[in-house]
């Protein structure tokens, strides 16, 4: 099995609408749904939710 099959690279986009993104890997077996992480948005200078985009 290829490396990207189990842990694909996904983009996390800010829900605040600034357009800022993070890239990360996720495990499809543990997280089959869209990933939502609370991370720092440097444009707003505060922590906001970042949601996986497809």
From Swiss-Prot:
Family annotation (NCBIfam families): PRK00595.1, rpmG_bact
A Pfam match is Ribosomal_L33
A Gene Ontology cellular-component term = cytosolic large ribosomal subunit
Q: Which molecular function terms from Gene Ontology are attached? A: structural constituent of ribosome
Q: What is this protein called?
A: Large ribosomal subunit protein bL33B
UniProt cross-references to SUPFAM superfamilies, sorted A to Z: Zn-binding ribosomal proteins
Q: Some GO term, biological process aspect, for this entry: which one?
A: translation
Q: Which gene encodes it?
A: rpmG2
Entry keyword set: Ribonucleoprotein, Ribosomal protein
| InterPro entries attached to this UniProt entry | Ribosomal_bL33, Ribosomal_bL33_CS, Ribosomal_bL33_sf, Ribosomal_zn-bd
Q: What is the lineage of its organism?
A: Bacteria, Bacillati, Actinomycetota, Actinomycetes, Mycobacteriales
Q: Which family does it belong to?
A: Belongs to the bacterial ribosomal protein bL33 family.
Q: List the disulfide bonds.
A: none
The family database entries (PANTHER family) matched by this protein are listed as: 54S RIBOSOMAL PROTEIN L39, MITOCHONDRIAL, LARGE RIBOSOMAL SUBUNIT PROTEIN BL33M
Which stretches are transmembrane?
none
């Amino acid at each position: 099995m290829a490396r990207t099959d189990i842990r694909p690279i996904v983009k996390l986009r800010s829900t605040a609408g600034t357009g800022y993104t993070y890239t990360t890997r996720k495990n499809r077996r543990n997280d089959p749904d869209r990933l939502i992480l609370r991370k720092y948005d440097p444009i707003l200078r505060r922590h906001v939710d970042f949601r996986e985009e497809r």
